[in-house]
Design a protein with these regions (language model features):
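Short, positionally conserved secondary-structure boundary motifs
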Residues: 1-52, 83-84, 91, 95-96, ...
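Short, hydrophobic/aromatic-rich segments at coil-to-beta transitions
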Residues: 41, 71-76
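Short coil-to-beta-strand transition motifs
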Residues: 58, 79-85, 117-118
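Structural motif
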Residues: 59-60, 74
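Hydrophobic beta-strand signal
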Residues: 63-64, 77
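PDZ-domain C-terminal substructure recognizer with occasional recognition of PDZ-binding tails
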Residues: 80, 85-105, 109
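C-terminal structural segments of small proteins and small subunits
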Residues: 105-112, 118-126
Length: 131
């Protein structure tokens, strides 16, 4: 489904606004910008506050791509004992862990097949309201 909304080509500065930028340059399709691999992409809503230190709030929408290979410190959706969670991936000494994204790394979940923990996708965008 194509959904276009007005897009201003002028960048939003942090200073004083220019009165010459009060017009729309073109329309933009958010799907084209947020979704790179349609068959492998899904959106999921966040429930909980464990990721607020990395800018992910309760109720946010996450755009997730299952085709991407996660990197160290990627934000991921993981399956932990048949429950989907959003966590930060940390790789150390040939081991991979999931953390809450806070500065406290003491609460780690080891990723391995015996524990029934695996990464389901990489978070590519976080959508949240600022109002």
């Amino acid at each position: 489904m194509k959904l276009t909304i007005p897009y201003y080509l002028h960048k939003a500065g942090a200073g004083f606004p220019s009165p010459a930028t009060d017009y729309i340059e073109e329309d933009i399709d958010l799907n084209m910008h947020l979704i790179k691999n349609v068959p492998a992409t899904f959106i999921i809503r966040v429930q909980g506050k464990s990721m607020v230190d990395v800018g992910i709030n309760d109720g946010d929408l996450l755009v997730v791509d299952k085709s991407l290979k996660p990197k160290n410190f990627s934000t991921v959706i993981a399956n932990v004992h048949d429950e989907l969670v959003v966590k930060t991936l940390v790789q150390e000494r040939n081991k991979k862990f999931l953390t809450s994204g806070s500065k406290d790394f003491s609460n780690r979940i080891l990723i391995n097949e015996e524990e029934d923990v695996f990464i389901w996708g990489v978070v590519t965008y976080v959508i949240h309201s600022t109002y």
